[in-house]
């Protein structure tokens, strides 16, 4: 390394340009190097970066993973691996004990399962090959290595480096016959001398000469050994720099970065990445292409090309994120602004601070351009696996950006989702997106994005985990599953800016997952144009999704048509509803409603729905509650700003809704959150939202009988959708269901009563939260979720099964959104509450949107049955439903209070039509079915989920509207998610099948 003319060892890799890595700096002698004890931890300064070392087998070895994540973070794993192989560096796997030592030393993340250790010399060579000039070793003109091999009878010769100018160069002179051979041929050349003993060639092949050819001198000088290592590394794929202009292009990176100031990619490349990568050749050629970023802003496809795959380090990622934001922003101006803001922050922070400003500008100014850039490549480009290959953003090479177009057509997708960012790139992108301009080292920005979008680190990012926010809807209006990356999505002029993308993505996924995909699709499709702006307004967590929800809800409402609409859609509508619910919270929240809903009546998601579908369904109306996840995000984002007004109207509508929930109540489009909010309203209202009135738990009980009738709307509310996200609730409700069947008439009150205390209590919080939040359901749901989890021990326990199924549904719809995106039930729970809120959500669902949201699915099946009854006898059945709740609440009051009511409400609402049949059935099997119903619910839930999954899968499979799915990663993610859910269902069904199959399955099938 000493030979390499790099800056001092103290230079920080990121801080300085290419010179940052100095050969000399590679390894600074460590004091106490002589007395090495096994597993002794040390530190080696490599190119100015401290690398943890461990004494293994008497040799000090460095953590390759740490080197890859720090010094070589700009290079893809494949690049590093190939180079390591090319250099003949063998990795020694550390033992579990050593791995733990490395973890505690901070070299490895706690989640790491293995770590390769390489010697200090090997680490220096590896880093030098990437960071140093790739120039052949300086050797005397007439120098030759005395080499020999032991293949066959063996042979000895002189390897003349001066002649080694290609992989096939005849540079080895046989010392026996004086003929010249190429290294590959020489190992097959041997003379059978009398004293030669035959040695099996040991898999000697045309490319194994580096293994078989050894220096004849058994103890050569270090300089000789190092020179030999360097020579062997020549013409070995790994060390071959890309055919880009040489590292000198580094300066180009800067201009590039300047150009990309708007484009973003060069920032990192220029500052930290440029220098580092420039030497890698990738930096040099790319700079010219990066300038196109400006063009990209203008809409130049090339620029688009460039920006997406900027390899720059953090800035690159940040800028990419900005770009992504800009692209999305093209869809949503507000988003573009946000992108600009976020991008600028990180960019400034990062090495490409200068670029950042440009980036910010590019984000806002180039929003349209970004959109245009999306256009250039609407098909996913799947570059050779390389850290950078996944996207310039991912690749930290300034130059690499040019080499590989971003796999995701829109830069934003990569940046926003940190999908393919290499190790830390994701973090950078996230930071950029978040606008966390902590790019001082660029590492900070990276970390930000990674954490923002998902916990995965850069390496994980390389194979990105499922999107944590739901993929925004595609241009076609088709929702993108949560686990699908939506590279083309940006192309869709959706307002899927990074800011809103989480919600939007969630919504998209929800729509996709919705069984009522047609409705969801149609609904989603129209709003995309409208939602983008609204979505843009979304901070990126809840609001955008909310907007999506509104549209989605409307869609759902419209497709279902009458009061039976939600239910009529069958399991499909419920899924849609559940989906809508998930997004609904957001829509009920800040103006997302307007976005998503055909009518951009931000405050009144329900209203928007009303407009969307003249006789929208209550479930639709409550879907916003269902969208608790979004609501929660919104609540967090917006505090309790808009929630109160919303909740008030919702409450009223809710109360009106409740009575007619099973009937379409187009005029009652207040968001479910609203419905939840008005717990203190009239007793009837309370009945609608008994839980919502925490202050008057008794009143809710009193109204409960009355509310039971209202509860029936719960069935109308599209219990199915709730089923999606309300698996937990379903489980808990399953118990309720049994009770419901046992004493529906009386228990409704009791159930309300039993559940009310907790529900009310939680509801109080949630109500407050919801009220506080424009999406009343949002914050409250969040709380409810927590409450549900705490309070609904049973609910959550069943969730073990129920929640799991819920996860299945959700994973397709809300769960992925909620569980992944929201990490809590807030997302998940959101869907059930919407329908729930109208009837019981206010009392239980509303009170405990979180729990209900998430339990509707669990309770949904029972709801399903009950709902059938409620369909015919809405009020009576509702009463029964209430009883159900009451019973369950009594049984599991601690959690059922919220969850149960939530789930039941959903069920009644959505399943009301279907519940009629089961009312008597339920009553008969009150006790007997308690367990069975739970299982049945789970099974039905699974069945419904399967339907939705199939639907979603079909959509994903053959829909041109989802160009995103052309992406290999998307496909893999899709398949993985599908398989995962299949497995989960398989786990659940056997347990539920035995009990459910007999009666419940038949009943369920007859219902559905």
From Swiss-Prot:
Residues 649-666 have a biased composition (Basic residues). It comes from the Eukaryota. Keywords: Cytoplasm, Nucleus, Repressor, Transcription, Transcription regulation. Residues 724-739, 748-766 have a biased composition (Acidic residues). GO terms for molecular function: chromatin binding; histone deacetylase binding; sequence-specific double-stranded DNA binding; SMAD binding. Residues 284-294, 525-534, 691-703 have a biased composition (Pro residues). Expression is restricted to adult and embryonic central nervous system. Expressed at high levels in the developing cerebellum, ventral metencephalon and myelencephalon at 12.5 dpc (at protein level). In the adult cerebellum, expressed specifically in Purkinje cells. The keyword Repeat does not apply. Belongs to the SKI family. Acts as a TGF-beta antagonist in the nervous system. Exhibits transcriptional repressor activity. This is SKI family transcriptional corepressor 2. The gene is Skor2.
């Amino acid at each position: 390394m000493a030979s390499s003319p790099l800056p001092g060892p103290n230079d920080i890799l990121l801080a300085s340009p290419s010179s940052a890595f100095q050969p000399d700096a590679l390894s600074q002698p460590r004091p106490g190097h002589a007395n090495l004890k096994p597993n002794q931890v040390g530190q080696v300064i490599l190119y100015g970066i401290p690398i943890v070392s461990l004494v293994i087998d008497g040799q000090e070895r460095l953590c390759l993973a740490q080197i890859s994540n720090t010094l070589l973070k700009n290079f893809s794993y494949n690049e590093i691996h190939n180079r390591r192989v090319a250099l003949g560096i063998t990795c020694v796997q550390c033992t579990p004990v050593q791995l733990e030592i490395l973890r505690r030393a901070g070299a490895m993340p706690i989640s790491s399962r293995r770590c390769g250790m390489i010697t200090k010399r090997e680490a220096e060579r590896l880093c030098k090959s990437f960071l140093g000039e790739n120039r052949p070793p300086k050797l005397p003109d007439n120098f030759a290595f005395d080499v020999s091999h032991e293949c066959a009878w063996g042979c000895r010769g002189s390897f003349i480096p001066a002649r080694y100018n290609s992989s096939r160069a005849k540079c080895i002179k046989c010392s026996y016959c004086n003929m010249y051979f190429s290294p590959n041929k020489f190992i097959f050349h041997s003379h059978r001398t009398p004293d030669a003993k035959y040695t099996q060639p040991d898999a000697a092949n045309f490319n194994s000469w580096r293994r078989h050819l050894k220096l004849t001198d058994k103890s050569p000088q270090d300089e000789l050994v190092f020179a030999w290592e360097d020579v062997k590394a020549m013409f070995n794929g790994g060390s071959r720099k890309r055919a880009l202009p040489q590292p000198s292009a580094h300066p180009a990176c800067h201009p590039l970065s300047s150009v990309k100031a708007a484009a973003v990619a060069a920032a990192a490349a220029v500052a930290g990445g440029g220098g580092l990568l420039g030497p890698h050749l990738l930096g040099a050629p790319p700079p010219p292409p990066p300038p196109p970023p400006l063009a990209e802003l203008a809409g130049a496809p090339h620029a688009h090309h460039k920006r997406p795959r900027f390899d720059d380090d953090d800035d690159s990622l940040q800028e990419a994120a900005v770009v992504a934001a800009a692209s999305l922003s093209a869809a949503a101006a507000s988003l573009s602004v946000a992108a600009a803001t976020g991008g600028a922050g990180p960019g400034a922070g990062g090495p490409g601070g200068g670029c950042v400003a440009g980036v910010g500008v590019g984000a806002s100014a180039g929003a349209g351009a970004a959109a245009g850039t999306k256009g250039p490549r609407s098909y996913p480009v799947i570059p050779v696996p390389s850290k950078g290959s996944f996207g310039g953003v991912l690749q930290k090479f300034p130059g690499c950006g040019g080499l590989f177009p971003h796999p995701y057509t829109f830069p934003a997708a990569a940046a926003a989702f940190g999908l393919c960012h290499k190790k830390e790139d994701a973090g950078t992108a996230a930071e950029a997106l978040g606008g966390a301009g902590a790019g001082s080292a660029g590492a900070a920005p990276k970390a930000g994005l990674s954490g923002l979008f998902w916990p995965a680190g850069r390496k994980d990012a390389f194979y990105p985990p499922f999107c944590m926010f739901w993929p925004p809807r595609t241009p076609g209006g088709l929702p993108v599953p949560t686990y699908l990356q939506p590279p083309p999505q940006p192309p869709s002029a959706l307002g899927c800016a990074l800011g809103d993308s989480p919600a939007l993505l969630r919504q998209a996924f929800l729509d996709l997952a919705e069984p009522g995909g047609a409705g969801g699709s149609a609904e989603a499709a129209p709003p995309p144009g409208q939602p983008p702006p609204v979505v843009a307004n979304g901070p990126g967590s809840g609001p955008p999704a909310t907007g999506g929800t509104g549209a989605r809800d409307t869609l759902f409402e419209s497709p279902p048509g009458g009061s039976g609409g939600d239910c009529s859609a069958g399991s499909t509508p419920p899924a849609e509803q559940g989906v809508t619910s998930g997004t609904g919270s957001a829509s009920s929240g800040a103006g997302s409603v307007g976005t998503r809903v055909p009518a951009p009546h931000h405050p009144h998601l329900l209203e928007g729905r009303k407009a969307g579908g003249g006789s929208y369904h209550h479930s639709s109306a409550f879907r916003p509650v269902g969208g608790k996840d979004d609501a929660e995000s919104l609540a967090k984002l917006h505090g309790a700003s808009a929630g109160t007004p919303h909740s008030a109207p919702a409450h009223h509508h809710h109360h009106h809704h409740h009575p007619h929930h099973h009937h379409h109540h187009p005029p009652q489009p207040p968001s479910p959150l609203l419905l939840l909010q008005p717990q203190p309203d009239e007793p009837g209202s309370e009945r609608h939202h008994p839980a919502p009135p925490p202050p008057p738990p008794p009143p809710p009980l009193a109204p409960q009988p009355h509310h039971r009738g209202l509860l029936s709307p719960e069935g109308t509310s599209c219990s199915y959708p709730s089923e999606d996200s309300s698996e937990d609730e379903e489980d808990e409700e399953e118990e309720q269901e049994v009770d419901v069947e046992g004493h529906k008439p009386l228990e409704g009150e009791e159930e309300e009563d039993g559940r009310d205390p907790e529900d009310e209590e939680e509801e109080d919080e949630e109500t407050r939260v919801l009220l506080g939040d424009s999406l009343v359901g949002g914050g409250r749901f969040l709380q409810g979720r927590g409450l549900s989890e705490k309070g609904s021990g049973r609910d959550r326990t069943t969730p073990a099964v129920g929640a799991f199924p819920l996860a299945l549904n959700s994973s397709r719809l809300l769960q992925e959104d909620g569980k992944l995106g929201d990490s809590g039930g807030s997302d998940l729970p959101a869907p059930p509450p919407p329908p729930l809120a109208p009837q019981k959500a206010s009392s239980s669902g509303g009170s405990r949107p979180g729990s209900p949201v998430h339990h509707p699915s669990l309770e949904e099946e029972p709801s399903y049955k009950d709902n059938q009854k409620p369909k015919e006898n809405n009020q009576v059945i509702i009463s029964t439903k209430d009883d159900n709740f009451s019973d369950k609440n009594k049984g599991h009051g601690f959690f059922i209070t919220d969850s149960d009511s939530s789930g039941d409400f959903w069920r009644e609402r959505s399943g009301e039509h279907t519940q009629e049949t089961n009312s008597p059935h339920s009553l008969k099997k009150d006790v007997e079915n308690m367990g069975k119903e739970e299982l049945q619910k789970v099974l039905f839930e699974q069945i419904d989920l399967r339907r939705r999954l199939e639907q979603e899968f079909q959509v994903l499979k053959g829909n041109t509207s989802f160009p995103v799915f052309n992406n290999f990663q998307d496909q893999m993610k899709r398949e993985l998610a599908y398989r995962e859910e299949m497995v989960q269902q398989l786990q659940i069904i056997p347990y539920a099948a035995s009990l459910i199959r007999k009666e419940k399955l038949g009943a369920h099938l007859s219902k559905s």
